[in-house]
Amino acid sequence: MSAEEVLENIRKEIIKKSPKEAKIVDVQFEGPEVVVYVKNPEIFTNEIIKSLAKDLRKRISIRPDPSVLVEPEIAKQKILEIVPEEAEITNFVFDANTGEVIIESKKPGLVIGKEGKTLEMIKKAIRWAPKPVRTPPIQSETIKAIRATLYRERHEVKEILRRIGRRIHRDIVVRGDYWIRVSFLGGAREVGRSCLYVQTPDTRVLIDCGINVACEDKAFPHFDAPEFSIEDLDAVIVTHAHLDHCGFIPGLFRYGYDGPVYCTRPTRDLMTLLQKDYLEIAKKEGKEVPYTSKDIKTCVKHTIPIDYGVTTDISPTIKLTLHNAGHVLGSAIAHLHIGEGLYNLAYTGDIKFETSRLLEPAVCQFPRLETLIIESTYGAYDDVLPEREEAERELLRVVSETTDRGGKVLIPVFGVGRAQELMLVLEEGYNQGIFNAPVYLDGMIWEATAIHTAYPEYLSKEMRQKIFHEGDNPFLSEVFKRVGSTNERRKVIDSDEPCVILATSGMLTGGPSVEYLKHLAPDEKNAIIFVGYQAEGTLGRKVQSGWKEIPIITRNGKTKSIPINLQVYTIEGFSGHSDRKQLIKYIRRLKPSPEKIIMVHGEESKCLDFADTVRRLFKKQTYVPMNLDAIRVK
């Protein structure tokens, strides 16, 4: 049966089971949802929608028909008339494709009203579905640009969703000899260019598609694998916004991919920021990049954000559920339910199985699980990291001692994740009087932090409590100063004042952190603190390993040696990855316990060591694939 025939059957069922007074205008597949356009959406109660979803076994979305929506400018005025001024509305975002209007205000409770009465009044007056959110304390240019693109290209986005929907809902007959295999196109026995290719007789799914920024000759996944074909690809899933997991996604669109990208909303925004930053840095350094800014926009238009815990059809036989991974904002464990109860596979991406200042720990309970693919960054026997409190004390000690002697502290960080964790520690240390110096934020850190403030529901309970109930937002502290230009960076470097500098990139592979290192390295009163993983071959690993001189390429393309006289520290307790103890604890706590466990995302020796330990401790089948290996899991 074709997708059109499937849709026609669904349309008839919905019309038959829906109240006539709802006045159904159209029923369409849009991405993973069946969208019902009606003239009177308020007729559809939650009970009716749940009943339809259960009977049809599809996600049902009820939307107002565009013909009944009040013009946005008039709608704004009506909302302002209904909502009390004390709510302090700051912005409206109208989404014509969903019929929603996001209402940003400083007091969203007043937009909702007692028992939701104000929301009901808004809905009746404008017919749009109001979605009240708290005004982000720092405005994000990335989110603004994404919203503008989706609004401007709304007709194209709708067509994209309908095309994707028809592909997802095509009718498939599941064979008796149904098989499932996973090919490892990158990130096996290495850290960088993570890329898994899941194949079944009827579906092809890519999970992550990263770039190894530290190694030019092994930068991209193995798209030359004989089984891989971009034309056959049904879906791409992104676990989180770090370049080694999402850096190549726009390149897929450049080379012919035209399907969906699934991830959480924060991941969509953060990966867009990272990809743009990667382009800009590569351009400045004269490096080739496999895509353009136009491809990043195309990627945004094809991205379908899904929330944690929401099960979504991504093909006729595969359902995807994303769960919190605890690694960075919006990071996810991808759980695939394949066939009707046939097989369940989960890929952790990068996980942190511990509550951090910023995030809750990774989820370890699933409805069903036969195979787990898990990261092994810190999987070796001696990969036991210090306690976080100990790491925080050590960080503040080094910062205090260095600034007291008039030095500058450079902390190279990933713009997403570690930077925000460190901001929280430094803000607390500054408030306690442990050090008295400004903290400069360079690279994309300020913008990444703005995106964090837009998604408070993804932060830890403690952070939400601080921001919403205690009125204390650490990200807005006076200690933080934004470095927004080359001139401002120059002033920080030339100034005699002691300070702390958080700058990207975290492994000194490019960006402002390298620029600061050039100028701070010769002076022994300065210090550099490594707080994240330094991959083999990176400048960060060389400095960390004790090199006394490092080669730096100048702007005119010549190589110059820089002496390393500054103090070098490594403080490991801030990693966003689980250490060996946490990885073992995670496997012990997994419910249900999987039959097979596959180790990836770690140096070869660490993957092998971790696999051997898990095999002995838990009596499980373990695998340590190499790149280009394929494992048949079913």
Swiss-Prot record:
| Source organism of this protein record | Methanocaldococcus jannaschii (strain ATCC 43067 / DSM 2661 / JAL-1 / JCM 10045 / NBRC 100440)
Q: Any idea which positions bind Zn(2+) 2? A: 244-245, 350, 601
The region called Beta-Casp is annotated at 382-575
Query: PANTHER family given for it?
Result: CLEAVAGE AND POLYADENYLATION SPECIFICITY FACTOR, CLEAVAGE AND POLYADENYLATION SPECIFICITY FACTOR FAMILY MEMBER
* Region called Metallo-beta-lactamase N-terminus, residue ranges: 179-381
Which parts of the sequence are annotated with region: KHb? 70-137
Its name, as the record gives it, is Transcription termination factor FttA
Q: Name one GO biological process term.
A: DNA-templated transcription termination
Q: Which Gene3D superfamilies does this one have?
A: 3.30.300.20, 3.30.300.230, 3.40.50.10890, Ribonuclease Z/Hydroxyacylglutathione hydrolase-like (3.60.15.10)
- Name the protein family: Belongs to the metallo-beta-lactamase superfamily. RNA-metabolizing metallo-beta-lactamase-like family. FttA subfamily.
Q: Where does Zn(2+) 1 bind?
A: 240, 242, 327, 350
Q: Which SUPFAM superfamilies does the UniProt entry name for this protein?
A: Metallo-hydrolase/oxidoreductase
